[in-house]
Amino acid sequence: MITLQNVVKEYTSRNNKVLAVDHVDLEIEQGEIFGVVGYSGAGKSTLIRMFNGLELPTEGSVEVDNLLISQIRGSKLRKARQQIGMIFQHFNLLWSRTVAENIAFPLEIAGVRGEKRRFRVNELIRLVGLEGKENAYPAELSGGQKQRVGIARALANNPKVLLCDEATSALDPQTTDEVLELLLDINKRLNLTIIVITHEMHVIRKICNRVAVMENGKVAELGDVLDVFRHPKEKVTQRFVRQVTDSDETEELIHLLLDNYAEGKIVKLLFMSENATQPVISQVAKENDVMLNVLHGNLTQTQNGAYGTLYVQVLGTEEAIEASLTQLRQLKVETEVLER
């Protein structure tokens, strides 16, 4: 669906050169929700603007739905952009137009007239849950409602791709989740390819199938969201994963557990996918004659599946404890004995 090959974007001023995107290769499949996460200045917004030709690469090629966006200009590019919707952090609505008129704007530009345009606008208002707000102006809407207008406007011409550039960064947590649920619903209903640019790992965890982590213009890490959360390889990825896993709190928790539970062994268990929801603990305890005391745990859901972390106190003989850990590993549960 979308292919980036050796894409470079360089900005040149009188005194220096800035390499915003540094030799990026990506393949994004039809119908997937693909996340790009990075801190400010990582190059992610520059990258997404090359998907619809708002920025042109200095080197390399950008192909969307078998069309080389990086090589077309003028009317051909304008026509191609009708198939690539985009929503923004600050909504970019026309403040003198109502909700319905904002949604109708791209249809007007595309030459859609009369009853056909009105039907499409009403259809989109229902899709994004804005019934009753048709004649409201942007100043009368909440942040979440404004973004829903932005989403409806971006979908007006039935695009195949939706670009989301920090689309939830200006929203509160509850509204963020509501907008993300809407994007998930639209993705499933329309089989729409969605590219999400964000600096919030919660957004990636909630809706994305795969993620690229960017740093200094490069893709530092790429993979399924579940794999990246479970085994982040690069330091920048580990920092992002800590946004969701609260590792500083975990470090404090480990010291607390080791200080307060002196008997037996304290073990960290990592469950994946189907094992995250199965009664593995009770099975292992029963079959190996050990006591497993659950001290702390959490379960994290992603679009690829769930993974869970448990901290347990294992009580029994040395042989029984070792046998229980061996069985857990055989059941594809990762184990880590915490050292005192």
UniProtKB/Swiss-Prot annotation:
Its EC number is 7.4.2.11. Gene3D superfamilies: 3.30.70.260, P-loop containing nucleotide triphosphate hydrolases (3.40.50.300). It catalyses: L-methionine(out) + ATP + H2O = L-methionine(in) + ADP + phosphate + H(+); D-methionine(out) + ATP + H2O = D-methionine(in) + ADP + phosphate + H(+). SMART domains: AAA, NIL. ATP binds at G38, Y39, S40, G41, A42, G43, K44, S45. It is found in: Cell membrane. Keywords: Amino-acid transport, ATP-binding, Cell membrane, Membrane, Nucleotide-binding, Translocase, Transport. SUPFAM superfamilies: ACT-like (SSF55021), P-loop containing nucleoside triphosphate hydrolases (SSF52540). InterPro entries: AAA+_ATPase, ABC_transporter-like_ATP-bd, ABC_transporter-like_CS, ACT-like_dom_sf, MetN_ABC, MetN_ABC_transporter-like, NIL_domain, P-loop_NTPase. Residues 2-241 form the ABC transporter domain. It is an enzyme of class 7 (translocase). GO terms for cellular component: plasma membrane. One of its GO terms (molecular function) is ATP binding. CDD domains: ABC_MetN_methionine_transporter (cd03258). It comes from the Bacteria. Disulfide bonds: none annotated. It is a peripheral membrane protein. Belongs to the ABC transporter superfamily. Methionine importer (TC 3.A.1.24) family. Part of the ABC transporter complex MetNIQ involved in methionine import. Responsible for energy coupling to the transport system. The complex is composed of two ATP-binding proteins (MetN), two transmembrane proteins (MetI) and a solute-binding protein (MetQ). This is Methionine import ATP-binding protein MetN 2. The gene is metN2.
